[in-house]
Amino acid sequence: MHKQKTIFMFSGQGSQYYQMGQPLYAHNAVFRYWMDHLDAFCRRSWGASILELIYDPTRTRANVFERTPLSGPAIFMVEYALAKALEDAGVRADLTLGASLGTFAAAAVAGAVTPEDALTSIMRYSRVLEQHCPRGGMLAVVADCALFEAPELCSRTELAAINFASHFVVAGLEAELADVERWLGQRGIAHQRVPVSYAFHSRWIDAAREPLLRCFDELPLQPLRIPLICCAQSRTFHTWPDRAFFWNVIRDPIAFSRTIAGLVHEAPYRYLDVGPSGTLATFLRYLLPADSGALVQRVLSPFGGELQNFEAVVGAVRLGVPERV
């Protein structure tokens, strides 16, 4: 009987919240080590503490965490630290999957880039966006993806992601998004702002293309230790692609639904969400056929239970017993 392969899934902008990973930071030595280590690097490099931001005692999980220049490094730190804590406990990835910004953590865990270099690249690209791009945002819509063809949406925004049949994301400038929100609200269509400051995965970041390509070209890369699945291209990479890879990751639409459809035909994987919110695990519940044989697990959640989830995932792997979280 073949061992079920594990995919570590890393989500991107929008999955962040204050106090994310706090129970693990308090109780898991490996998670805390990597958070402290990476925060010390941020302090030395930019004079800013990401830890002080994430675990600001005046902020709760309910507060909106929208500061893009710092939310990117914060997401990366939490995802990388959680992956290392899982590895130390015996839970290892056979493949990594990255959605948008999460691809940086996926690449680091796959051995292609050091966490310090990945953090540097994330901070640089956040500053490039500030210098070259207009303020904008993203809006998640809970409706059939065909709704995007409505003139009120497609004339004002661009399709940024398709997560499953009845969940998609649009990107646009602030004024246009406000109009779209009003239009959706008038029709009783569920929607939610993604806590970002720019219209990722759309033409409104194209002004940053050349400086970002130069930024990513300076990122030292090593051969992939394990395969990396890219949701921007719905492809599994066994060798490192061209230098435009990370630009495509933040510019092209996130094709999560199509990516998973391809994986379902390969094998019944164990999908382990290593993101702060468990968002990708939630999407999978709408994508995987009932008879797929796949397992879906998460550790972190804005609703709590992180320590129990961590122990359940580790215990299931040690015992070889499938356990859903």
Task: Give, region by region, the residue ranges found by the protein language model.
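Cysteine-centered functional microenvironments
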Residues: 61-71, 95, 155-171, 196-200, ...
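Hydrophobic side chains in well-ordered alpha-helices
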Residues: 121, 148, 179-180, 259
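Short, flexible, solvent-exposed loop/turn segments with mixed acidic/basic and small polar residues
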Residues: 126-132, 155-162, 236, 262
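Phosphate/diphosphate-binding loops
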Residues: 143-145, 157-159, 166-167, 212-215
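Helix N-cap motif at beta-to-alpha junctions
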Residues: 145, 172-178
